[in-house]
Regions:
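Fe(II)/2-oxoglutarate oxygenase catalytic core
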Residues: 1-181
Length: 181
């Protein structure tokens, strides 16, 4: 991460074929999240709509030249952190993703809260820190989300990251649903 100025830590993307547990989680999460994503698209008056199955959506990614899988493992040692960022890897992007904490807060690490920052139009940014337990999954926007506006839903730009790990080692599984170029 440091050489790209993304933070301090290590990340590794999985290749195809994905490990069975990772593929199974991605398959299970996608359909209900596609319903939410399509609701977001509708509320923001956007196209396209997302396919009901992950296989159909991945086929669309591949047809658009995005063929590299994006699920990854993230590892942060004491002093490690992840800069506030968005995960969009091409023209085709699914608006939600999932992070699953694999380590145990306390025995394995301290610090390392999951961070979300939403930029509301014509207003100050709003940040939230989320303390996860081992095995917890958080679903969050990869780039933006609908938020309340004076005349109906508006686009709120959103970034995510990880605060500094004070002690130990924090491991996370990241499930991004669109493939990359």
């Amino acid at each position: 991460m440091a050489r790209h100025h993304y933070g301090q830590g290590d990340y590794r993307y999985f290749g195809y074929p994905l490990p069975e547990p990772v593929a199974a989680l991605r398959e299970a999460f996608y359909p209900p999240l596609a319903v939410i994503a399509n609701g977001w698209q509708e509320s923001l008056r956007r196209e396209p709509r997302f396919a009901p199955t992950l296989a159909e959506f991945i086929a669309h990614c591949h047809a658009s030249g995005q063929q590299r899988p994006t699920p990854l493992l993230l590892r942060y040692e004491a002093g490690g952190w992840n800069a506030m960022h968005q995960d969009v890897y091409g023209d085709v992007a699914f608006p939600l993703q999932v992070a699953i904490l694999l380590s145990r807060p306390g025995p394995d690490f301290e610090g390392g809260e999951f961070l979300l920052l939403s930029q509301r139009p014509r207003a100050q940014s709003r940040g939230e820190a989320v303390a996860l337990s081992q095995g917890d999954a958080i679903v969050f926007p990869n780039a933006d989300r609908p938020g309340p506006g004076a005349r109906g839903p508006v686009r709120w730009a959103t970034r995510h990251g990880v605060s500094t790990v004070r002690t130990g080692v924090r491991m996370t599984l990241g499930l991004i649903f669109h493939d990359a170029r």
